[in-house]
Amino acid sequence: MDSEFFQPVYPRHYGECLSPVSTPSFFSTHMYTILIAIVVLVIIIIVLIYLFSSRKKKAAAAIEEEDIQFINPYQDQQWVEVTPQPGTSKPAGATTASVGKPVTGRPATNRPVTDRPATNNPVTDRLVMATGGPAAASAAASAAASAAASAPAHPAEPYTTVTTQNTASQTMSAIENLRQRSTYTHKDLENSL
């Protein structure tokens, strides 16, 4: 047997046929998937930024609105000297405050007992007290009687504040009415002073 019959026959470009086929890159095969994912991420980021900015605007508006509304006047008000009005009882442990100290133990109500109906409007309370309406006369009489009977000697104006020149009874009744409400406006504060 001749060995030349068993020689393999190679095609001309056999080396080129055996070279590995170049596989496409990851980006070229998944190009559309990657682009869609990037677009979705950008949309999500834009939506989140919009939501957080609107929340910040709402929070800023709420804080600004809270700055306009006044809190309980007793929280920040500094009184020169506080003594209970005639006709009210001092609770146990209540002390008189001095300058620089907030009022801590105040009576449940600063208004003397009267026969007039209680109103929550500081404007009408102030008008009734200023004009000396029928309820104001009986209130003055009952206050004088109870002051002579049970109260020790007090200064002429027991409720003097650092910031106002109004009489004590007008200021305290208006502030007491404001204290019973939850929100206040500039007009309410002006009416109480």
Swiss-Prot record:
It is found in: Virion membrane; Host cytoplasm, Host cytoskeleton; Host endoplasmic reticulum membrane. It comes from the Viruses. The keyword Magnesium does not apply. Sequence repeats lie at residues 135-138, 139-142, 143-146, 147-150. Residues 84-126 are annotated as: Disordered. Pfam families: ASFV_J13L (PF05568). Keywords: Apoptosis, Cytoplasmic inwards viral transport, Host cytoplasm, Host cytoskeleton, Host endoplasmic reticulum, Host membrane, Host-virus interaction, Late protein, Membrane, Microtubular inwards viral transport, Repeat, Transmembrane, Transmembrane helix, Viral envelope protein, Virion, Virus entry into host cell. The chain crosses the membrane at residues 32-52. Residues 135-150 are annotated as: 4 X 4 AA tandem repeats of A-A-A-S. GO terms for cellular component: host cell; host cell endoplasmic reticulum membrane; host cytoskeleton; membrane; viral envelope; virion membrane. Its main location: virion. This is Inner membrane protein p54.
